[in-house]
Amino acid sequence: MNYYGGKELAESFRTVRKNTLAIAQDIPEDKYDFRPMPETRSVGELLAHIAISNGFQKKIHAEERLNTLAGFDFPSLMKRLSAEENTPRTKVQMIELLTKDGEAWAKWLEGLDDNFLGEVVTMPPTGTPPARTRFDMILSVKEHEMHHRGQLMLIERMLGIVPHLTRRMQERFAASAAKK
């Protein structure tokens, strides 16, 4: 028995996506083109990457239920996902994409059972490690989003925006201090 199954994956992913959406809403649309360095993704590009990049795991587990990645056509999938990421979007469209895609992914996660999550997927011949469980691979979607959300929070600071989670913490501290 797993203590962390499909329902828990879905709920934790929804929490992560809710926080990503808060950042997407807090950053003004005229700053979506901001990039900290020329060779980095802009705010809009990071948000698009977050919204689209789970397409890799979706293809492997939800659409094709592959048990091996040997022979998988990575270049074709990456080309398609890259084209989707590079589609120009307004702030409203980006928030809609993050919302719609996030909820569709979470609903799929909710239906996963322990047997499915425990299945092993063999990596390509040069893959390290040579095999991973579906649970590990699917969990990486949330980990990947949190990685990029950390970048977005630093960008918020560069833009003079206090991240929403920091604002909440400051409000709690201020309320606690006011009671003393």
Where on the chain are the PLM-derived regions?
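Conserved functional hotspot residues or short segments at active or partner-binding sites
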Residues: 39
